[in-house]
Amino acid sequence: MGRKWNNIKDKKASKDANTSRIYAKFGREIYVAAKQGEPDPESNQALKVVLERAKTYSVPKSIIDRAIEKAKGGSEENYDELRYEGFGPNGSMIIVDTLTNNVNRTAADVRAAFNKNGGNMGVNGSVAYMFDATAVIGLEGKTADEVLEILMEADVDARDILEEEDSVIIYAEPDQFHAVQEALKAAGTTEFTVAELTMLAQNDVELSEEAQAQFEKLIDALEDLDDVQQVYHNVDLGE
């Protein structure tokens, strides 16, 4: 298993403080999911996933409703989902997921962020094979043993269940994202601290202080791009 989820989350805290950027990214993602399928999350699994993730970031209902209404209204605005892969300092690996209405602009922006910050773009597949698509669900108020028992009784599989700080974090296959939550809800859980579909590195690397400083600049440059939705990497940033 890769880095503990709470360590990843802690390092994102300063970024997450920029709520307007977070909300804008979710608004775009909700719009795309609603436009590609039904605007009802009960009949649109992709939309349901995004809404469950948005809840853990406290995205306001007004932003969610506006994005869904925009999709219902037949907006002609179209977005492509594109993934870029690349390398940072000392062979560190990075995956960048984007939603874009201008592929050429996004490709140029992502390439520039890599090139200006000690990295370089790779070809498709050059990095992703070192990561596993993973559902990550977090909750408070139960022990890992209690969660394991709940999931076993519901016949839901998990890769790993870990106690991290005050939370229990469940790592599962992506197709178990809803099943894990439904089993826990049936056992009384009403709120999740984490609900993510992510890419977890199979192995982490540690960088020197100088290389890590440059790496963090690269990650910041990528995350600051409007078209970038998610950035995944294999660097252990420490505490």
Swiss-Prot record:
A Gene Ontology term for the protein's cellular component: cytosol
GO molecular function: DNA binding
UniProt KW keywords: Cytoplasm, DNA-binding, Transcription, Transcription regulation
Main location group: cytoplasm
GO biological process: regulation of DNA-templated transcription
Keyword DNA-binding: yes
Annotated Pfam families: TACO1_YebC_N (PF20772), Transcrip_reg (PF01709)
Keyword DNA-binding: yes
Highest taxon of the lineage: Bacteria
Places the protein is found: Cytoplasm
Family that this chain belongs to: Belongs to the TACO1 family. YeeN subfamily.
Protein's UniProt name: Probable transcriptional regulatory protein Bcer98_0465
Record organism: Bacillus cytotoxicus (strain DSM 22905 / CIP 110041 / 391-98 / NVH 391-98)
Taxonomic classification: Bacteria, Bacillati, Bacillota, Bacilli, Bacillales
